[in-house]
Amino acid sequence: MMLCMDMPRDLLHERFSGETLNPLLQWMNPPSLWRIDQACSCLLMEPDRETDFWQETHYGFRADNGHFLFAETRGDCTATTAIHCYPSHQYDQAGLMARFSAECWIKTSSEFEPNGPSHLGAVVTNRGFSDWSFQEFPYEQFQSGGGMAYCLRLRREGRDFLVEHAPAEAGPWNLMRVARLVSDPEQLCQIGLYACSPKGSGCRVEAKFLRIQAPWASPQ
């Protein structure tokens, strides 16, 4: 049988339907309030106030206390999630992150603006300096009970990362950012879900799943 080299393989597929998290997952700075809701098969979390990931640029501060639920991977991979975020304060955010260190990482998420329009954004941090890009949130907000619903995909290809967004897991997927992280392509990478509330508390996040995939390896 011929092996399809383009078919991805699951490194992790957490549907948040069990009593505990997949043992491959671990927290960096867990929020005070989080739990698995088996009734809706999602991870619920409420980011603590004054939490963020940012390094120096323009604003002159460093923050590395955001909430990050990750698995460790090596080599090329793709992380995908579906998020429903109920924000309360400006810059409330939830999405995906890939991280090598406090000074080398990428994150992508919704970014709430109470006076609108809200954003989908990406922050790329190299050598301790962050670079922020964003676009207007392209999907309907505050419909059917409120919140912002969206899917995100973060692909690692060597040193390069591609950020994509979609209204649903089936797509269509839209490219939002292509960036390089100054890191060893063989270095262990932490990749997974993150959430922050840089100002006040009250934001609620539902993560429907976290899937991390890698390309099929050549048979030996």
List the model feature ranges, each with a label:
Residues M2-Q220:
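Extracellular glycan-recognition regions
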